[in-house]
Amino acid sequence: MQEYIERVAAGEDLSLDAARDAVTTLFEDATDAEIGALLGALRAKGETEAEIAGFAQGMRDAAITVAPDCTPLVDTCGTGGDDYDTINVSTTAALVAAGAGIPTAKHGNYSVSSASGSSDVLDALGVELATDPAAVEARIETDGIGYMHAPAFHPGMEAVIGPRRDLGVRTIFNLLGPLTNPARADAQVVGVYDPALVPVLARALSRMAVDRALVVHGAGLDEFALHGDSTVAEVDGDTVTTTTVSPSTFGLAEAPIDAVAGGGPEANAADLRGIVTGELTGPKRDIVVANAGAAIYVGGGADSLAAGADRAAAAIDSGAAADTLAALTDAHAVQQ
C-alpha cells in the first residue's frame, strides 16, 4: 500500500490492475491512515478512467454476487451529489423499465445529494432492504426487478467509512456506486454530478466490458433533464460517442427544475407510487418517462430514445409499471 501511496502522491497514474489490487488491499489490509492517504492523493492528482475502472473491478471482486439468468440486465444508478432535491427519478425509472419488460437489477443506497435516496424511498414503500442474493435473483427472474441495497452487498466498504468521513471531501468512491452493481448489469444508465465526468466514466465502463451504457449529466442533474440539454456518452462495446440531447429528443416538453422537486422519503414514495400508477402526470411523470426510456433503449427494448420513452409511457398507462411495484413491494417485504 505504501508503494501505491508514494506513486500516486508523486503524480503517477495507476494501471487498471494496480488500482484493482489497491482497493483489495484497502478492504483487507490497510490502516485508516493509509486509506486516507491514498484517497487524498488520488483526489489531488485526479482519478483516471483506468483507476476508476480498476477500483470498480476490485469492489465487484469483493461484493456479494447476484447472478440472475437474464441478459441483458439493466441498472439505473447515478453518482448522486448533484445538490438538487428532486423526486427519486432513477428508482422510479427502474420500475417503469421493468414494467416494460426489461430485466432490471437496481443498485442503490441511502441519500447522497437529496432528502431521499433509492433505499430511503423503497424503505418508505415497505421494501425490505437487507435481502438475500438468491432472493434478489429470483425476483429479477420472476418479476423483472430486484433491489440491492449497496451496504448489504459491499461489506468491504465498511473498512473505508471512517477514513472517508474524516477526509470530508468527495473521493473516488463517490464515483463507484453505478459501476459496482453486484449483479454486474451489462446495460446501464449512469448519471453523474459533473459534466466533465461523462466521458471519463463512459471510458471506464467500456474498459469494464459493459455491453451498452449511457452516461449522462442533465443541466446540473445526474439524470436526463427536462429543464435543459443533457450531455450523454453512449457506450457500445469499445465505442464511446458523446452527444447532446434535449427533452424533445424523447418527445417531451421542457419544464423548470422546480417542477420535479422532491421531498423526504414519504413524500417521494407518494410521488413514485403516483407516477407508476398513472395518477400523477406532468413534469414528474415526464422526467421518469425520459430516464426509463433511456433504460429501455440500452436494454435493447427500443431503437431510439424516443421509442424507449413511448414504451415507458405505455408501461405506465397499461398498469404494467404498477404491477411491477406491487410485486417488488410484496416480495421484498417478506424476505429476511
Curated annotation (Swiss-Prot):
Q: Which top-level enzyme class is recorded in the Swiss-Prot or TrEMBL entry?
A: transferase
Q: Which Pfam families match?
A: Glycos_trans_3N, Glycos_transf_3
Query: Which Gene Ontology cellular-component terms appear in the entry?
Result: cytosol
Chain segments annotated as coiled-coil in the UniProt record: none
Instruction: Locate the residues binding Mg(2+) 1.
Output: 90, 223
> By its UniProt entry, which InterPro entries does this protein fall under?
Anthranilate_Pribosyl_Tfrase (IPR005940), Glycosyl_Trfase_fam3 (IPR000312), Glycosyl_Trfase_fam3_N_dom (IPR017459), Glycosyl_Trfase_fam3_N_dom_sf (IPR036320), Nuc_phospho_transferase (IPR035902)
Record function comment: Catalyzes the transfer of the phosphoribosyl group of 5-phosphorylribose-1-pyrophosphate (PRPP) to anthranilate to yield N-(5'-phosphoribosyl)-anthranilate (PRA).
The UniProt annotation places Mg(2+) 2 binding at 222-223
The name under which this protein is listed is Anthranilate phosphoribosyltransferase
**Binding locations of anthranilate 1:** 78, 109
Key words, A-Z: Amino-acid biosynthesis, Aromatic amino acid biosynthesis, Glycosyltransferase, Magnesium, Metal-binding, Transferase, Tryptophan biosynthesis
| Residues annotated as binding 5-phospho-alpha-D-ribose 1-diphosphate | 78, 81-82, 86, 88-91, 106-114, 118
Q: Which reactions fall under this protein's catalytic activity?
A: N-(5-phospho-beta-D-ribosyl)anthranilate + diphosphate = 5-phospho-alpha-D-ribose 1-diphosphate + anthranilate
Cofactor stoichiometry and binding remark:
Binds 2 magnesium ions per monomer.
Q: Which NCBIfam families match?
A: trpD (TIGR01245)
Q: Please tell me whether the keyword Metal-binding is annotated for this protein.
A: yes
**One annotated GO biological process:** L-tryptophan biosynthetic process
Q: Give the family from UniProt.
A: Belongs to the anthranilate phosphoribosyltransferase family.
Q: In which pathway does it act?
A: Amino-acid biosynthesis; L-tryptophan biosynthesis; L-tryptophan from chorismate: step 2/5
- Give the gene name: trpD
Quote the record's binding site residues for anthranilate 2: 164
User: Which cofactors?
Assistant: Mg(2+)
Q: EC?
A: 2.4.2.18
The GO terms describing molecular function are:
anthranilate phosphoribosyltransferase activity; magnesium ion binding
